[in-house]
């Protein structure tokens, strides 16, 4: 069943399924993205840094968070028009190969648009690892179809 703008309310909370991030997935993301910082690709180098080992690029974390949200049933692909933006992204803890992450989302605001067929959903996403540590936080805005017309 399609979920429209009116089907959400401020304060709604959702949690995505978890995903274990493999070494292979990180290697593909790093390769495609052109990431080459030694602390991301050289384990021995990274062990000697305050990080204590290799970590995933922050932008890879945001990419994986988007995938988890996409795979969940938080948004209906029939009614989402576009992701309009991501704001105030913060990386709190490193993501490492073998970590399992999930995203907790809360609808924080809803705004009508000039177009009566669309509305904006503003939400906060928090990515946590298997230990409950916050890996990243971001505020997002999605443009969603409305049930009501004019």
Map each language-model feature to its residues:
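HotDog/MaoC-like acyl-thioester-processing domains
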Residues: 3-10, 94-150
């Amino acid at each position: 069943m399609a979920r429209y703008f009116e089907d959400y309310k401020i304060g709604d909370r959702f949690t995505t399924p978890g995903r274990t991030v493999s070494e292979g997935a990180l290697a593909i993301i790093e390769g495609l993205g052109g990431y080459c910082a030694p602390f991301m690709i050289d384990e021995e180098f990274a062990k000697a840094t305050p990080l204590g080992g290799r970590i995933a690029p922050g932008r890879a974390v945001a990419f994986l968070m988007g995938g988890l949200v996409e795979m969940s049933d938080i948004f209906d692909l029939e009614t989402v028009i576009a992701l309009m933006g991501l704001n105030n992204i913060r990386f709190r803890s490193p993501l490492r190969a073998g970590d399992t992450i999930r995203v907790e989302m809360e609808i924080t605001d809803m705004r009508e648009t000039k177009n009566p067929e669309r509305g904006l959903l503003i939400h906060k996403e928090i990515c946590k690892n298997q230990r409950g540590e916050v890996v990243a936080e971001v505020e997002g805005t999605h443009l969603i179809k409305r049930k009501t017309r004019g």
